[in-house]
Amino acid sequence: MPMTVRCGDTLLFQTLPVIAAGAAVGGKKESEGPLAAEFDELSADNRFGQSSWEAAEKYLQLRAARLCLQKAALPQEKVQLALAGDLQAQCTASSYAMRELGVPFAGLFGACSTMAEGLALGAALCEGGAARNLLAMASSHFCAAERQFRTPLSYGCLLYTSPSPRTPLSYGAVRTPTAQWTATAAGCCLLQPQGEGVGIAAATFGRVQDYQVKDINNMGAAMAPAAASTLLHYFKDTGTEPQEFDCIYTGDLGQVGSQLLRELLAAEGLLIKNHVDCGCILFDANEQSVKSGGSGPGCCAAVLCGHIL
């Protein structure tokens, strides 16, 4: 069996493991966006009939997995490993989804890079003979993420004035122009060592780049340096240039992060005129009030499985 070749930070796959099938599921805002027609399933109910936002995210991921297997005509019993992650603490949504799916499971937490991480690790496992049928998936849910990370008082509990009579207070901060909207979406890919489908030729694992961006409402600026560093290493390791590719996709830098990415690469002598950010195309920024664009693990996962594939 051919061995994966390592060149710098990049793994070069010799057998081209393939994405044999993919499925994307989204919520209400995604159903109103420009890519709505390319989802496998959409719901106007962001709870998806579940009792909580967190349970809804579990449903998102489970539904994407089952649709993916259905499209591949593969019984779930033949899945040898699932690599999955989400934005909840300790991969809660993924763990509960995999409890119902009943397949071997390894949880991933790469936040917005989870889908790419799953594809890279999955391709390496497939080429190495560790799995013949492997699922890579990721999800996020706007309300679950807001409750956990950003505005717990608004989505989780009530803050009361004192003394009595107690009056509930609502969280009323204005979203800044650099802020992004966490996608309520999930995507799932079925990876196989060989066969019909889109081949995975290489994978570059990025390095942490900390430019001391401390604005919690500007994640695009925080992520752009790592995106630039990863692309620079990929081009160096593979001996390729940006213009050789039909398109260069990033996950969810948003409008602000995408502009910074282009500036950082231009400073290194690279122009990426063929760049598209998944967070910039999932929603219509002018019509849907998402500020700088979409974000979250489910953003690029759904765009990959629904739009790109």
Regions inferred by a protein language model and the residue ranges of each:
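A generic, well-ordered mixed alpha/beta core segment in the N-terminal half of proteins
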Residues: 96-147, 151-159
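A generic local secondary-structure boundary/capping motif
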Residues: 6-9, 123-126, 155-159, 175-180
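Conserved "HGTGT" condensation-loop signature of ketosynthase/thiolase-family condensing enzymes
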Residues: 1-106, 168-178, 187-309
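Conserved small/polar residues in nucleotide/adenosyl-binding loops
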Residues: 160-165
